[in-house]
Amino acid sequence: AGNDTNNAYGNRWGMNMSLLPNPDTGLVGTPSTYSAAISVASVDNDGYEQLYITVGGADFGYQDTAATSATSFIANFRNRELEYVMVPGYGTEADYAGIDVNGKVAVVSRGGNSFPEKQSIAQANGAIACVVYNNTMGIVNMQINDGAGNIPAVSVTKAAGQALLTQAESGNAVFRVCNADTQLFHIDRTISS
């Protein structure tokens, strides 16, 4: 990541090197302020403005990477209450045995298979959408099968997945999609690892 060049690239001396009196210091901040450090843009935001779902009275942001309105979560489900089913495992075909997701949202864990596979398998089993919850801290930006003929699919944090599970175990497996407004959601990480 980052740029492998310096401010002397293509200079008139033909060496692509800074002159001794003009070192290439660039713009550096903590934690890479040590004089011998090579810095790369590697800091994550500690919060994101996101569309959200409401589960049991708590709001959780979601990531929607759909490029078309056909698979956009908000375009399809704005301000609606949706029934969902927690699919065990990772949302592979075998995980749907004995599970009825027809007309509901399939909620699956990250891992085990690709995001487009999770989406396609949920759709093949009758789901109207797929929510993938992270199996580790942080958020997930996933690529999906986009466009007409595919169901919407979004990703949520591990905490949102846990809230969805708790809500389902209480016997009230529904969540509400926001009305196209966003909220700032803080995440646990601030520096890339």
Regions found by a protein language model. Name each.
Residues A1-S193:
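Structured lumen-facing ectodomains of secretory-pathway proteins
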